[in-house]
């Protein structure tokens, strides 16, 4: 039996912390699907990058991992996990502050899909302070992103904010 997992998230943008979790999850499972969530219509918080841009950035960051695929999905993560045959959903934990939310989310997933387990991986300590929101703020203000995101993501952020300033 092949063990599949889904690592869902907005990934707006993918960070080195995300890449770290993906690399480690890819060692634990036969196949890992990184699910880029695209269902933001009507929500107050809109992503900076489109779903297809986020997919492209993630694919470039993860192309060295042969057992990882990047998809775009909308709807419930547990429904998508079932649709792709995943037995587990991977979640990354940066700090104790993430735990309460992830704990509640895991119980909701369990309620909705008892057949899908949740596996939480602690981020490596050098990435424990990184969040996509923080990365976007640093990029917008012209800060140094070295070591925080893959180089191509840093370049995409610079270009995106240049474009937004022109508009």
Swiss-Prot record:
| Key words, A-Z | ATP-binding, Coenzyme A biosynthesis, Cytoplasm, Magnesium, Nucleotide-binding, Nucleotidyltransferase, Transferase
Q: Which HAMAP family match?
A: PPAT_bact
Its subunit composition reads: Homohexamer.
Any Gene Ontology biological process = coenzyme A biosynthetic process
Highest taxon in the source lineage: Bacteria
Q: Which cofactors are reported in the record for this sequence?
A: Mg(2+)
Task: Please state what class of enzyme this protein is.
Answer: transferase
In Pfam terms, one family for this protein is CTP_transf_like
Residues bound to substrate:
10, 77, 91
The EC number of this protein is 2.7.7.3
What family does the database annotate?
Belongs to the bacterial CoaD family.
Name of the protein this chain belongs to: Phosphopantetheine adenylyltransferase
Q: Which GO terms describe its cellular component?
A: cytoplasm
Q: In which pathway does it act?
A: Cofactor biosynthesis; coenzyme A biosynthesis; CoA from (R)-pantothenate: step 4/5
Q: Name one GO molecular function term.
A: ATP binding
